[in-house]
A protein has these predicted regions:
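Non-heme di-metal
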Residues: 1-191
Length: 191
């Protein structure tokens, strides 16, 4: 489900909030990549990919932090992300299975979904936000986020032995589309 374009108007009323929330999204994405390395060291290609994603996400964090500083704003404290919590709850209620492969697939689909939604939000911001600097900033970020979500899906397919990953992804997408009906009303990256 596409984000309602009116979300950008909400964001424009509080640029500080979207930038702070975005910075922490990047930090959490980097932390998630590190967790994947620690949990799945038996997959050298995944370790290499997660290491690269971690570096890139921290570069994005630094870029967002720089945008805050340029505007005389501070990072502030981390915000809770109800969207991420809702996705996590869906997966915890056994939407694939509890085998090691099922847990792995869930983690990959979870990361892919967050990256895909972030990419979609970056696209909207790159097309519609009035601030030309932020428009270009989000256009650049959108391209890397698209690569990230496909990376996670690729690993789910490669190492999710015995699981119909495409079916699980379609079901997760359907859930997320319903979930998004209650989002898009706050000046946060997923809100």
């Amino acid at each position: 489900m596409a984000t309602d374009p009116r979300w950008v108007k909400i964001v424009e009323k509080n640029i500080e909030e979207i930038l702070v929330d975005h910075a922490y999204c990047e930090q959490k994405a980097a932390s998630n990549a590190i967790s994947m390395i620690v949990q799945y060291p038996q997959y050298p290609d995944l370790v290499a990919a997660m290491s690269a994603i971690c570096k890139e996400e921290m570069e994005h964090f630094e870029m967002v932090h720089q945008k805050l500083q340029e505007r005389g704003l501070q990072l502030g404290f981390e915000r809770k992300d109800p969207y991420v919590n809702d996705l996590s709850l869906y997966l915890k209620h056994g939407k694939t299975n509890s085998t090691p492969a099922g847990v792995f697939v869930n983690k990959m689909l979870f990361a892919a979904m967050i990256e895909a939604r972030s990419c979609e939000r970056f696209k909207i911001l790159s097309e519609q936000i009035n601030d030309a600097d932020l428009r270009e900033f989000y256009r650049c970020l959108m391209e890397s986020e698209a690569r990230h979500y496909t990376t996670f899906l690729g690993f789910a397919r490669k190492y999710g032995q015995g699981i119909d990953v495409d079916k699980a992804w379609k079901e997760f997408l359907a859930f997320e589309a319903e979930l998004m009906e209650s989002y898009g009303k706050k000046e946060t990256m997923h809100g």
